[in-house]
Amino acid sequence: MASGKATGKTDAPAPVIKLGGPRPPKVGSSGNASWFQAIKAKKLNSPQPKFEGSGVPDNENFKTSQQHGYWRRQARFKPGKGRRKPVPDAWYFYYTGTGPAADLNWGDSQDGIVWVAAKGADVKSRSNQGTRDPDKFDQYPLRFSDGGPDGNFRWDFIPLNRGRSGRSTAASSAASSRPPSREGSRGRRSGSEDDLIARAAKIIQDQQKKGSRITKAKADEMAHRRYCKRTIPPGYKVDQVFGPRTKGKEGNFGDDKMNEEGIKDGRVTAMLNLVPSSHACLFGSRVTPKLQPDGLHLKFEFTTVVPRDDPQFDNYVKICDQCVDGVGTRPKDDEPKPKSRSSSRPATRTSSPAPRQQRLKKEKRPKKQDDEVDKALTSDEERNNAQLEFDDEPKVINWGDSALGENEL
């Protein structure tokens, strides 16, 4: 039985969640991490979880008599200025006799431990399930057939049939039942004119609200793949990934606003409706190969036709007008307001203000070195922090409905 012998392992999920199949392995491992993904508190200092049913995650490999264990609190932090900042706790499930509290019997009282058992479970028995080695095995998606945790907690929904190379976005189980917010209706955009941009921005908002997690390492990998396979990660500018915007040649799409906001700009997702898929680009393009001193250059010429009776035709035209050769420009509704006359009027001898008194300069305290900050974190906490790069709650903006279908993008 693998308990606390392993070192360097943690409850934190692997940097990239990979699912190898619908069932967790029957054989234990040498790691000390939970087989299952975590449930996460929505707020700091949330009370310990309560469950509608037994609280034991579904596992078809176990008999009913073996369905018992405990949920263990994992404190989480992210680095701040000179100190670490706490974030809401995560709770991980372990079978009785495994994990960090392997020496406890079922029901033993200990802070940060919540015992759970299915009806008919033999709580006096100890599990041979072991724990997970994150380097060898994937996390198993949480499923509760008889009810999950209370409303103070959430967990990321992961499809059971997703393979290791599959793509999906993790969706917050709590977010799926929330009604859309109406706050975005107060914005400047209204009517059908900007339906396309509104729908595109809503898709981005939904993806963020559903909790897609991208680590710092994954974002860097996305931005530095082979050029033709790159995608813009959250928080990156367009020119950081695809180079400066130009006019009249390759790289001529995007105005200054789009360059700064990257994928947060709703126009990006809107225009992706018109971008060909990989297969369409390969088999529907005029392909021109050309040998150059630095290698083989492949040119793909593809034409997407937007019918004039398309309900979003005018919006596509508007975006193209703004973004094709748009470097150095911004949308009219995004231009900064001109300063008032009083502030823009040149100063004269009669109107010049009296010189201000010089404030005493404060002595600059030497900043704490990075190694001093790092000393405040344990090795387990550092590994946890690696997962928190994009773990903050996204800003929820409801841009309204539009004419686009749900699955067009």
Swiss-Prot record:
Biased composition (Low complexity): 162-179, 341-356
Spans annotated as Dimerization: 226-333
Biased composition (Basic and acidic residues): 180-192, 247-259, 368-384
Any single Pfam family the record assigns to this protein: CoV_nucleocap
GO cellular component term of the entry, any: viral nucleocapsid
Similarity remark: Belongs to the gammacoronavirus nucleocapsid protein family.
UniProt KW Phosphoprotein keyword: yes
Domain of life: Viruses
A GO molecular-function annotation: identical protein binding
Chain positions covered by the region annotation RNA-binding: 29-160
Modified residues (Phosphoserine): 190, 192, 379
PROSITE patterns given in the database record: COV_N_CTD, COV_N_NTD
In-chain residues carrying the UniProt-annotated modification Phosphothreonine: 378
Compositionally biased tracts (Basic residues): 70-84, 358-367
Record-given protein name: Nucleoprotein
Disulfide bonds: 320-323
SUPFAM superfamilies: Coronavirus RNA-binding domain, Nucleocapsid protein dimerization domain
Renumbered residue ranges of the record's region Disordered: 1-32, 46-84, 121-194, 238-259, 326-409
Domain CoV N NTD: 31-156
Location in the cell: Virion; Host endoplasmic reticulum-Golgi intermediate compartment; Host Golgi apparatus
Main location: virion
Subunit structure: Homooligomer. Both monomeric and oligomeric forms interact with RNA. Interacts with protein M. Interacts with NSP3; this interaction serves to tether the genome to the newly translated replicase-transcriptase complex at a very early stage of infection.
Residue ranges constituting the CoV N CTD domain according to the UniProt record: 215-331
Function description: Packages the positive strand viral genome RNA into a helical ribonucleocapsid (RNP) and plays a fundamental role during virion assembly through its interactions with the viral genome and membrane protein M. Plays an important role in enhancing the efficiency of subgenomic viral RNA transcription as well as viral replication.
Name of the gene this protein is made from: N
